[in-house]
Amino acid sequence: MASSDKAFTLDIVTPQKLFFSGEINSVIAPGLNGLFQVLKGHAPLLAALKSGKVRLSLSDRSEDTFQIAGGFFEVSGNKAILLTEEVS
């Protein structure tokens, strides 16, 4: 599918593997002070994450959700990286 003009790249990485790498329209993640959402063009960000649910809105308009065991989230340019110990 063609890249959406609303999409940006997200990598989800655990110590064992690259769990996800692809284009998404948004991500909602569990920050230490509550949920936050990131869209394309977000200001640079580095945030600590607590255990909880992550929701992806994929560029093909589908959604995906999964649990993480805390970690860190970084946004720079139109790329985001979520580092976590475990994803289920």
Curated annotation (Swiss-Prot):
Keyword Hydrolase: no
A GO cellular component annotation in the UniProt record: proton-transporting ATP synthase complex
Principal place of residence: membrane
Alphabetic keyword roster: ATP synthesis, Cell inner membrane, Cell membrane, CF(1), Hydrogen ion transport, Ion transport, Membrane, Transport
Protein's UniProt name: ATP synthase epsilon chain
Organism: Chlorobaculum tepidum (strain ATCC 49652 / DSM 12025 / NBRC 103806 / TLS) (Chlorobium tepidum)
Family from the record: Belongs to the ATPase epsilon chain family.
Membrane topology, from the record: Peripheral membrane protein
Gene: atpC
Localisation per UniProt entry: Cell inner membrane
Protein's UniProt keywords contain Iron: no
Cited Pfam families: ATP-synt_DE_N
Domain of life: Bacteria
